[in-house]
Amino acid sequence: MSTICAISTPYGSGGIAIVRVSGESAIQIVDSLFQGRKSLMEAGAYTIHYGELIKPVDDEVLDQVLVSIFRAPHSFTGEDVLEIACHGSLYIQQTLLQWLVDAGCQLAKAGEFT
């Protein structure tokens, strides 16, 4: 099964946007872009972690975020799910999606999260 990602908040700019990632590699993929106090791989279920999204290639910082972790099978999709709460500019949302795709996610199709 593939790991998917999508913006969960309505289209457009807002104060906060939520990007959801689901699948067997979700935690590894988000952890590869996240720098916080501890690795997301070591984090427990139903926890929230503050940190920065950093592009591994050149250490570019995109945003300060909160990442919520919901581990399988007790999540909305039954798989590992992470919700990334980032600032809501379209640039940040689209760049984050591109970074996730570059790291191994596929863009979710309409209805895949529901």
Q: What do these predicted regions represent?
A:
Residues 1-114:
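A glycine-rich (often HGG/GG-containing) alpha/beta subdomain
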